[in-house]
């Protein structure tokens, strides 16, 4: 596909434990002739949460994989985080973003809401009272707090999402995507806030040398 006329870039979604050195070297070669973005599913920086959701790789491995990718500055990285994971507080969700953007040389971020789907283990946890779903107000507040600490040079690719209605147990308010987006904008305006207004500047090795 990359040799087809008109193809100017490639975007790959994967896991930190699925990128051996030879794959990264191949992506580095591609990045010399087209735009290359690698999207990494991090979801959380907390190991206890990782164990609960069976992520099966550590935050340490994620950090190391980002470093290996960014040895090649033309490879851009987009990280995925999920708000509302089991046991995570508002403060932990904000900390997930803080760690993600200060520990790692990333160029983009996608922020998701936990969608509870049918035929999952979390469905049982929810019905047995071990999982609480976020309200729209809670989600809007945490997203705005996260946006404030994300440096302005990092591209926000997503701040909410949706799921198939026939498979979604909750939160049902997430189906009204534009309502959620409008609520986030309204809250940012109420605060007089913008992306990165509380961000801490972080300098990475490849930025010092380019």
Regions found by a protein language model. Name each.
Residues 101, 107-108, 115-210:
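Auxiliary Fe-S-binding modules of radical SAM enzymes
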Residues 10, 38, 77-79, 156:
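Hydrophobic/aromatic residues located in beta-strands of well-ordered beta-sheets
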Residues 4-19, 34-62, 110:
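Core AdoMet radical
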Residues 23-27, 86-103, 166:
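Catalytic cores of alpha/beta
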Residues 6-9, 13-15, 60, 69-75, ...:
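Conserved N-terminal glycine/acidic-rich loop preference
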Residues 1-5, 25-35, 67-72:
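Acidic (Asp/Glu)-rich catalytic clusters
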Residues 62, 93, 139, 143:
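Aromatic/hydrophobic pocket-lining residues that form the small-molecule binding cavity
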């Amino acid at each position: 596909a990359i040799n087809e006329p008109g193809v100017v870039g490639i975007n790959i979604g994967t896991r930190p434990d699925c990128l051996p050195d030879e794959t990264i070297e191949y992506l580095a070669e591609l990045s010399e002739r087209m735009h290359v973005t690698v999207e990494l599913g991090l979801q959380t920086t907390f190991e206890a949460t990782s164990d609960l959701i069976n992520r099966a790789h550590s935050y340490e491995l994620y950090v190391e994989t980002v470093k290996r990718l960014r040895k090649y500055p033309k490879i851009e990285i987009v990280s995925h985080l999920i708000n509302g994971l089991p046991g995570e507080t508002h403060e932990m969700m904000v900390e997930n973003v803080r760690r993600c953007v200060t520990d790692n040389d990333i160029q983009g971020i996608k922020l998701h809401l936990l969608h509870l789907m049918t035929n999952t283990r979390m469905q049982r946890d929810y019905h047995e009272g071990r999982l609480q779903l976020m309200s729209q107000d809670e989600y809007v507040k945490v997203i705005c707090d996260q946006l404030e600490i994300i440096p302005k040079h990092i591209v926000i690719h997503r701040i909410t999402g949706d799921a198939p209605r026939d498979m979604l147990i909750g939160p049902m308010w997430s189906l009204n995507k534009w309502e959620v987006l409008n609520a986030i904008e309204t809250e940012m305006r109420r605060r007089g806030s913008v992306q990165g207004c509380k961000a801490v500047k972080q300098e990475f090795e490849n930025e010092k040398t380019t």
